[in-house]
Amino acid sequence: MRESAGRYRPPVRPRQPAVRRKHSRLAVDVVASPGLRAPGLGAWLSSLAPVRARGAVTVAVVSDARVRALNHRYRRKPLVTDVLSFPSEDPGYLGDIVIAAGVARRQARQAGHSLQTELRVLALHGLLHLLGYDHERDNGRMARIEARLRSRGGLREGLIERHR
């Protein structure tokens, strides 16, 4: 798929079928740039998804340059960021979560944990944005939900806490 007429299109096509956990209503496709692996990320995110997370989502782990270009095009910010979320208008498809691989590596080093842990932190944060939460405007609601899910998923720190 390609970007066209100002509408977002996923940066890469999923190569494997979506992972849907036995008790989850969320199917997660994970696609990563060549040379990068994200084992278990889809199953982990699906297992933690809030009840209202129904349908499918794609998590794409791409280059910093790709994220910078997407951030500039869709948010008018010519900077690389760690994670972007692109909600879908299709009721069966929540949207896309795009993670900058280089930023994730650097943040993992700074936080003292693995890249896989950082990918989980970023994917969870992106999923909550796809569900409509906005930590800049919701008086801590997203932070509380993220903290609860993070704890359930074995993560000690989330993205919102880091930036406070």
Give the predicted meaning of each segment.
Residues 1-119, 128-164:
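An acidic/histidine-cluster motif and surrounding catalytic segment
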